[in-house]
């Protein structure tokens, strides 16, 4: 089976030199990995989380070409089938690929969170999006209070944004 590093390298190549996309996925992966480890995830859940974090925006290049934007709904719609194809030769099990595809296909739908891997992916992506887009303190505080559930995600958010 491919390692996380090999999947990361493959995703960087897939990103075709888009430095913003590569930096974003790298940052989301870093936060997801950190939160997952601090929360004590089992090895398989941690692996699935990290693969999902690396590939969560896999549909962005296609969405830019097809729709002219990277709207979250389009990302979810296009991302699940793309990630299945992307992961087909990694040696991951069908169950692992199914879960990653589910996470990628729902990563803009926090109301549907159904597991710790999904929760952490949402938290990690939010931290990075808030940083990249300069979300105001109140928006960050509101998200933290209403959507964040992990102690590690809340601690990191408080530390990063001073809320």
Predicted regions and their residues:
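Short alpha-helical hairpin
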Residues: 1-10, 53-59
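Divalent metal-dependent phosphate-bond-processing catalytic cores, especially two-metal-ion Mg2+/Mn2+ enzymes
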Residues: 2, 13-26, 30-42, 55, ...
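Active-site metal-coordination segments of metallo-dependent hydrolases
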Residues: 16-27, 65-78
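An active-site-proximal "capping" alpha-helix that borders the catalytic cofactor pocket
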Residues: 28-31, 73-89
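Membrane-helix interface segments
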Residues: 43-45, 96
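His-Asp-centered metal-binding catalytic motifs of divalent-metal-dependent phosphohydrolases/nucleases
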Residues: 46-68, 79, 101-108, 125
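Mid-chain, well-packed structural core segment of small domains
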Residues: 86-92, 98-106
